[in-house]
Amino acid sequence: MILLIFLDTHLHTPMCFLLSQLSLIDLNYISTIVPKMASDFLHGNKSISFTGCGIQSFFFTTLAVVEALLLISMAYVRCIAICFPLHYLIRMSKRVCVLMITGSWIIGSINACAHTVYILHIPYCPSRVINHFFCDVPAMVTLACMDTWVYEGTVLLSATIFLVFPFIAISCSYGRVLLAVYH
């Protein structure tokens, strides 16, 4: 799909560009988790280095946040196209689309970097077994040898910002679209 959108000039629209970014995220999700999981399955070695765990956590968190922000962008583009069709070209210029995508990647990377740096610098107990098939922040927090309630609060805040608010924004966007179609 990414190649098709890149090659066909008729598909050089904001929504198609956002769809290609979403496809890129899906490809990266697979390459973040599956290779290590497949290696563990084939070789029976279920360990990962501390650095490898940090890298996997960083990319997984980045992709999750970027996906949520891109879905908001897609909802916005859809809402503008349906509710304000005459303003679409003004509100959805190529520059605006590139800014939405770039902003999503930058915000996702900053959020993931903050969580990954913190999670890699807390003291861990001697037992470092994660009962999970990949490294992510909640699984690693359970291994900490310190009180992590403040950090867990920031994880909850981050999850609220990047999961609950996007869900509400997307729902409102669809509500606005349905209202416009109804009228």
Per-region residue spans from a language model:
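Transmembrane helical core of 7TM receptor-like proteins
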Residues: 1-183
